[in-house]
Design a protein with these regions (language model features):
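Alpha-helical cap/lid subdomain in secreted, periplasmic
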Residues: 84-271
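Serine-esterase "nucleophile elbow" of acetyl-processing enzymes
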Residues: 1-78, 88-89, 257
Length: 271
């Protein structure tokens, strides 16, 4: 059995944006569907994405079943929690893929805790953060803090971005996440492969990270690998991401190429 955990790059979002949209908000009957009917459509699209994701294509290549737990927009802390909560389902010899996302989606310990009740994230990724002049907050935050408090926070966020932000904070957090999961997978006796979706988890090799099972550690991400082919057909069509700086997801063909690459890597380290 294959189990995969990660963000939208693992879940399969964008494998065929036109089809996905035609079954969701772009469906001619979407506005008159009941909630149950909309949920049926969402489940249909989720199955389509999972089938065509690198997990699904890898599983078919070696002829075993798979369970894709990828979740669009999640953080690396979410991925850690999902793995540990689901881990009782792992059997010895199972394969586990972990597609890490941007560190900037993790909760920050030195910001007020109620921010995270509104799904607050520093930024979707590093490329987007570099263009921010202040941090973005959800209007729902006003349910927890006054306008005066938020006025201060937005002003402080300008100072934070120019004077306080330091990637080293995430290095230490990510180092611990990686090592915890590697030790857990060793304990569970599963065959795991880690990879980065579009931002690197860490910028150097720390003492206790076993890079043997980490695909192209600190060299390539899913996005950079797919983009290196200079083939637009390997990426989702443009115009669907909220920020222009957000790396585009792999298409069905992009996931196919990644699955083939991971198949070679898996055989190299486990056979």
């Amino acid at each position: 059995m294959i189990h995969s955990f990660g963000d939208s790059f693992t879940a399969g979002l964008g494998v065929d944006r036109e089809y996905e949209n035609s079954q969701l908000g772009g469906h001619p009957d979407w506005d008159v569907m009941t909630d149950d009917e909309k949920n049926t459509q969402r489940s249909k699209v989720e199955r389509f994405r999972n089938k065509n994701s690198y997990t699904g294509q890898f599983a078919r290549k070696i002829g075993i079943g798979c369970s894709n737990k990828g979740l669009s927009g999640c953080s690396n802390v979410d991925i850690l929690n999902s793995i540990f909560e689901y881990g009782d389902n792992f059997k010895q010899g199972d394969i586990v893929f972990v597609g890490f996302t941007s560190s900037l989606r993790n909760p920050i310990s030195f910001f007020p805790r109620k921010f995270y009740k509104t799904d607050f994230k520093l930024a979707p990724n590093l490329r987007v953060l570099k263009d921010f002049t202040e941090l973005k907050v959800n209007e729902k935050i006003l349910e927890y803090y006054s306008e005066e408090s938020m006025s201060f926070f937005l002003e402080y966020s300008k100072f934070y971005l120019t004077e306080m932000f330091d990637e080293q904070y995430y290095e230490i957090v990510n180092y611990n996440i990686i090592v915890f999961l590697q030790k857990y997978f060793e304990y569970k006796k599963v065959n795991y492969i880690m990879l980065d979706a579009f931002d690197y988890m860490v910028n150097k090799n720390y003492e206790h990270i076993d890079t043997k099972y980490y695909w192209n550690f600190n060299k390539k991400t899913i996005y950079s690998y797919i983009a290196s082919f200079n083939d637009e057909d390997l990426l989702e069509v443009e115009g669907y991401n909220l920020h222009e700086q957000t790396p585009r997801h792999p298409s069905i063909e992009g996931h196919k190429i990644l699955a083939e690459e991971l198949y070679k890597f898996y055989n190299k380290v486990y056979k």
